Amino acid sequence: MGILLAVPEIIAASVAGGAEALSIAGSGAAIATGEGLAALGGLTESAALLGETVEISEAAATVLTKVPELVTVTQGVTAAVQGGAGLVGGIYTALAADRPGDLPASTPTGSPSGLHPPAGYNPQGGGLNIQSIHKPLHAPYPGMALAPIPEYNLETGIPGVPDWVFNFIASHLPELPSLQDVFNRIAYGIWTSYYNTGRTVVNRAVSEELQRLLGDLEYGFRTALATIGESDPVNAIVEQVRSFVSGGRQRELLQIAAGQPVDISEGVSRGTATISNAVEAVRDATQRLSQATYNFVYDASTLPRDGFNALSDGVHRLGQWISMPGATGGTPHYAAPDWILYVLEELNSDISKIPTQGIKRKLQQNGLHSKASLHSKTRKVTKKSTHKSAKPSKTSQKRRGRRAGRRTTVRRNRV
């Protein structure tokens, strides 16, 4: 699924959670990107990264308990490291104290947070199925609301950080350096410092670079999430797609007015070429927007409908195939969140075909009857002028005579 099917769900869940939930998700995003540095600095505890404890009020705990999608999204944002420690573990630990029934008793306890299986667990042995995004995803325990998101083979080469995090940073925070650039800079600093002066300068360079990275990410994500909290994500998606469709309509109208046939295959081939060149589209900002919009329209139009799309208590895994228990065992179903269905309804209410024959006929009529309309206007003006110069009628003459007689009578009485 494209970035528009992943990021707006995070935005919608964070907005629904309130201001405090947004602040929690913001620090979780900063911690998530910092956990990718575990191979360099040995950072395994999320609390040690910020040096503070997570305090959750009763209102925020209620929001997070009633909206399990927000907990799942926060877990995806943090992208917990292999040890299983992370901000989501701290959030769930605080929530489990108030709601101990949320976590099944048979949950594996191989990690401090209880969200990851113990060491030696075979992912392919009937438990967590690390496969492609469109294949069934089986949870290691019955609690689907707490099933961890698998760690896929990422194109960027940084384990534990999903692809949409880099796309989100590149699209919303263009002024920040990319994580790959920061990693290359750290590696180059380690090599040159060790070659020149030794271990002291190495530690100093790594520490300064890590602190700078964490500070930039924390500030950037706080700013981005604060802006997101004041927006309406669903209507923003609808307006984006409508502007995309209206641009195509305007282009077709110009072609029809010029007498050129509308080439539909050109748009299809252009979209296919954009998908095949996804790497180049990410590098170019303009092509990235077109690619994201095309991916959203294509994915939304090909959603299967089987009665399980509007799951209120289930988990949709950001638009993935999930396995739900049933009478015949685990059956995979495609679960789409409610905001996708709302967007589809809004889009279908405004999309219609262009009346090509009606437009041509209207243009021809305007060209033929222009002289006739001008002639009718001159006739109206002539009638008005002749009406003013005509002689007064007999009735008006009688009225004037009566008024003159009354005036003479009044004058005689005064005398």
From Swiss-Prot:
Keywords: Capsid protein, DNA-binding, Host endoplasmic reticulum, Host membrane, Host nucleus, Late protein, Lipoprotein, Membrane, Myristate, Viral penetration into host nucleus, Virion, Virus entry into host cell
Cell inner membrane among keywords: no
GO cellular component, one term: host cell
GO terms, biological process: symbiont entry into host cell; viral penetration into host nucleus
Motif (Nuclear localization signal): 377-384
Biased composition (Basic residues): 372-415
Molecular function GO terms recorded: DNA binding
Region (Disordered): 102-121, 365-415
Top-rank taxon, per record: Viruses
Lipoprotein in keyword set: yes
Residue positions bearing lipid (N-myristoyl glycine): G2
Consequence when changing Q250E: In strain: Isolate B0
Region (D1): 318-353
Region DNA-binding: start-end pairs: 358-409
Similarity section: Belongs to the polyomaviruses capsid protein VP2 family.
Protein name: Minor capsid protein VP2
The organism of origin for this protein: WU polyomavirus (WUPyV)
